[in-house]
């Protein structure tokens, strides 16, 4: 197995965040206005496995869209190094990143590609009969995703997503469960007003209370970072100063801005924190349109070149769609989050005194980050915690 250059692994972490927030903006342009969550880590890992088999103009387009600094052969070990770091056993929290290839039994794949995805991503190739048992294959893949995410993601691939033309499904599943370094006192949780959707009318939601955290301010926002036990991962919450200010903050949202916010926070023992409990569970998002708009339309077309996957003489391949689904729950003890991404490939047819208050009583953003690499594992928007 080719070892990863540490600089390439760091670059892949940066690319993960940049690409994920591109997808975020594309979903916002689609008209997704309610609660929303995505996993940049899951999306980038699944598409990095796909990019490993891309060649020619398709590889160039995917490299640009995914913000990758390296060619397919160098990206596979770089992404794999990050996946292995996330999967390293820990006593303080659970972070599991699982990958698998589900391949059509009759199709001839390139041995070198299957070996690379196995060695770098831990993605074993399982043969299924898409041609005559498409629906049973879909159910089997969904069961695998469910088991990898502790049953939080039950139906990644919707009905009709697998058909007799399907040749390969590349799946990534991410599961996280962590406890706050300083837990909220459940006895202090009380129903308080939350101005859902930034409007004038409020709804009563269970709101957690704490004192202390990593706090900062930037133009138009307050920032709170809550570390998880082990202090390797943290949730950063970005609260617009204006009750209806979320849209303006999202207009300028990109990876550079997130890093800027992260650099603003410092430890404060006096900040008064009020944060609603929340749970977000997205439906299965089909992302083909968004990814085409971001610059990789060729990968979905009859001009796609995924010949790095297929054996010589095998029928040409193209991506048919990319499916993504996320679950995030935040409470007094900590956070549970899960995400899954499936790529379906088919044959072509600093504050002043007094002590600051961080009262999240209106819509806000959150980012679950790997504070070592800076990679965004999960990103979300809460407009109504109910």
Predicted regions located by residue number:
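N-terminal low-complexity, Pro/Thr/Ser-rich intrinsically disordered segments
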Residues: 1-15
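Extracellular/luminal recognition modules and glycoprotein regions
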Residues: 17-28
């Amino acid at each position: 197995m080719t070892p990863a250059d540490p600089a390439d692994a760091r670059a892949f972490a940066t690319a993960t965040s940049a690409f994920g927030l591109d997808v975020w903006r594309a979903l916002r342009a689609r008209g997704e206005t309610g609660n929303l969550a995505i996993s940049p880590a899951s999306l980038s890992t699944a598409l990095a496995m796909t990019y490993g088999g891309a060649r020619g103009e398709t590889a160039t387009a995917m490299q640009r869209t995914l913000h990758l600094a390296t060619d397919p052969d160098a990206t596979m070990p770089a992404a794999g190094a990050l996946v292995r770091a996330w999967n390293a056993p820990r006593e303080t929290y659970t972070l599991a990143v699982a990958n698998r290839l589900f391949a059509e039994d009759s199709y001839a794949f390139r041995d070198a590609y299957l070996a690379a995805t196995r060695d770098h991503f831990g993605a074993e190739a399982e043969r299924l009969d898409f041609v005559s048992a498409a629906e049973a294959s879909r159910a089997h893949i969904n069961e695998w995703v469910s088991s990898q995410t502790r049953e939080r993601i039950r139906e990644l691939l919707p009905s009709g997503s697998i058909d007799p033309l399907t040749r390969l499904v590349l799946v990534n599943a991410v599961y996280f469960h962590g406890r706050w370094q300083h837990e909220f006192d459940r006895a202090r949780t009380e129903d308080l007003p939350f101005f859902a959707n930034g409007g004038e009318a409020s709804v009563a939601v269970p709101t957690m209370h704490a004192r202390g955290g990593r706090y900062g301010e930037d133009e138009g926002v307050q920032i709170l970072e809550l570390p998880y036990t082990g202090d390797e991962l943290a949730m950063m919450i970005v609260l617009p100063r204006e009750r209806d200010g979320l849209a303006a903050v999202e207009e300028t949202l990109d990876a550079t801005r997130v890093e800027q916010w992260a650099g603003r926070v410092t430890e404060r023992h006096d900040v008064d924190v009020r944060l609603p409990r929340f749970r977000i569970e997205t439906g299965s998002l089909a992302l083909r349109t968004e990814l085409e708009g971001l610059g990789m339309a060729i990968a979905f077309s009859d001009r796609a070149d995924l010949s790095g996957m297929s054996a010589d003489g095998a029928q040409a391949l193209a991506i048919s769609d990319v499916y993504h689904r996320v679950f995030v729950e935040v409470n007094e003890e900590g956070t549970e989050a899960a995400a899954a991404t499936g790529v379906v490939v088919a044959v072509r047819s600093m504050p002043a005194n007094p002590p600051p208050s961080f009262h999240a009583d209106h819509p806000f953003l959150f980012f679950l980050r790997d504070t070592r690499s800076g990679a965004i594992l999960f990103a979300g928007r809460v407009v109504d915690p109910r």
